[in-house]
Each structure stands twice: as C-alpha cells, then as structure tokens.
C-alpha cells in the first residue's frame, strides 16, 4: 500500500536555535499526515553562545555549528537550501530566491536578524558579527595575516581594535578577539576600545552582569566609550573594526511589498502574541531575533533557545487543533 498523502505542510524558515529543537524532537512527537519542510540559505548554523569561544580559540568552528541537513534527515524533513525573497501570508506561500514558490498550512520564522557594517577605508579590516559565514571567512584571513606579520620593529605600533556595540555580542567579541590576538602574537601590542551609544554596556541585563562585563573589559585593557554614536568622521582610528551594533530585520521584512500584510514593528520585526503567533496571521509563528515581543527583548540567542519548547508545543497544537501554550520570557540567564 502506498503511503497516504500529507494533510498539512509545516514550513520552518530559518536555521535558528528554536527550529533545531523542533527538528530534534520531531521524530518522537510528529503527528501523522504532516509534511515538514525546512528552508534556509545556511546549512550550518552557529550556537550563538559558543561564538565567542570560537573567536577566542577555545572551540573549533565545527564544534559550534548545528548541521541542519543532518537534523532534517533524522527528522524526515525536506531540506530546501534557499532564502525567503517574499512572503504572502494571505495566500500562505513563500517565494524563495531559488525561484521556488512554497505553500504552507503553518509557517514558523526563526530567521534571526542581520547587521549592516559601515564602509570603511580599505586599510581597515571590518568584521561583522553576522552572518557567521562571512565572519568566519574574514576572521580566518585576519588570523592568517596576524600570524604571518613580521613584527620585527624595535617598538611596533600597537594594533588598534575598535568594537562597536554595547550588547553581549560587542562585549564578548572584543574580549575574545583581543585575547586571541595577544595569545597568538605576544610580541605585538594590541590596543582595544569598545564604543556604544547607550549609557552603559549590556543594556537590559541585570546590574550584576553589567558590573562583571565592565570589570572584564577593564582587566583586558579595553577602554569603554559610552553615549557615543558611531560615524565615519568621528570614529577613532583603528586597524580592526568589530561590528556588533544595530541588529536589523531582513530586507523582505522591512519592505511592505515583500511581506504582504504581515504585521511588523516599525523596524520590521514580526509582531507576535503571547503564544509566539503573528498578531495578524495566526498560521504564522515567529521566534528569536526576527520576532517582536510586546515587551521588547534583547537580541540574544538565549531567548530563542527558551522559546523552542513552547514553539514545538504550539506548532503541534495548531496542527491538531488543541489549546496553545503561553510563552513567558526568562528574567535570569
């Protein structure tokens, strides 16, 4: 006997933390008659909490990434290597940059956010913390040049590192990169500065976390400039710019013609209710950085991780027509 055709198609768009949890649990919890499809341009997705450890040299790159095609194979899901070009939530379909149109019964978005680094003088190496694929390429090249540098001057000029962004990514990346550079070449002096437009680092985090971060920065010799907006003309001279500021929604989310009538915040992030559903289209869910909770949350991976089990329960409930579960963000992490 041939297998019955699927009754519902569930599309997971984005290789994020929450979707990894859905895929891991799917073999044990999948309801009958559901086709699961995963769409992402990135086959290997980083666990964001381990990226600083990779930058510092504690982990290899393969240690910090999640192999999504392998997860899909174990879950019996179809893997589609493509990015969203357009969403029509009224027609319940995605148009992909591959040219494929993908219809869905339920859609979950876990596509993260993006960064737009500035255009700098060619003499400045710019490393944006997203996307990871570009960060890896740029960082590998930087370390290769750093180790190959002659460093034979009697009093070599310090290498100037500037990190922009006072969130967790900015703080952790400058500490990790400075430590890596000094460890690889203790003969070459490194000067570092972190710049943020906010009044302190780690806004929205507990005061204890801010104190620990400031202490670590001080011990590493990283100067901190607060209340400063980065501009090309006013930025201090640097050799390496670490860009971790201004998380943005993806272009299709910011463009009305490419997102249809999907409700988004003024910045383009998908507005969700207490059950992680779109406030305008209940067949669309959104989690992690791409989503806008009614009380804005920091763009930190720990939230997407904690959203994962709730997302799984609510996707299954939607497919089966049962009650949804409310999400309560953690207050400590």
List each model region and its residues.
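FAD-binding core/adjacent interface of flavoenzyme oxidoreductases
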Residues: 2-7, 74-160, 242
